[in-house]
Amino acid sequence: AYFPQNVAMNKGVIPSVDEVKQKSLRPLPPEDFEHIAEAEGALVLDTRNAEVFKDGFVPRSINIGLKGDFAPWVGAMIPDVRQPLLVVADQGTEDEVVTRLARVGYDNVLGFLQGGIDAWRASGREVDTIERIDAEEFAARLKQAPLHVVDVRKDGEWENGHVQGAHHASLQYINDHLHVIAPEATNYLHCAGGYRSMIAASILKARGHHNLVEVRGGFNAIKKTDVPVTALMCE
């Protein structure tokens, strides 16, 4: 895969991973974390699992889980490798996060949230959440009333079968598909398994869309229910 760092590498400006770690592995208490985020215009990257992220996160943070296609999606969602970043990570994974970011050119990590989201909560600061439901609950709600469903999978996945009546907004081009997001109705987001849809939900939430519900297990789980889907071309 092509990462933005290729351009910078060609210019010979990429510091070593060890140099990056020395600068970036900096524990920041909540007050410092918040101050730096505002002063530096830093993007807060939360690398925890979606299942944990949904229950509480720093407002306007983006969730790209470390235990998934982490580097490719960081490259797709954060095109500027010079973007200042602040990290929220599971305790003990901070080194891995900074290392993996540095390897694909993201060397401007300003530190990580010391004590994680628990410390942020304990400091009395605001925490955001995203509702996540099982495919069975999604099916039950769909029986009660029409839903505004947004499928964030890639074009080929969508064409191979999708929820009838759903709208398509591929995650990698989500900023070009904001017109698909309903401003008033609740948006039910899903991908294939739940990783990409939480990335999408976090991005949309950061952009001010709070009427979001994400479907756990994605289309793989949805198609096992009685939710009407278009003909599946391949399994």
Indicate residue ranges for each PLM-predicted region.
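Rhodanese-like catalytic fold shared by cysteine-dependent sulfurtransferases
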Residues: 1-22, 39, 50-235
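A contiguous, basic/glycine-rich beta-loop/short-helix subdomain that forms a polymer-engagement track
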Residues: 21-33
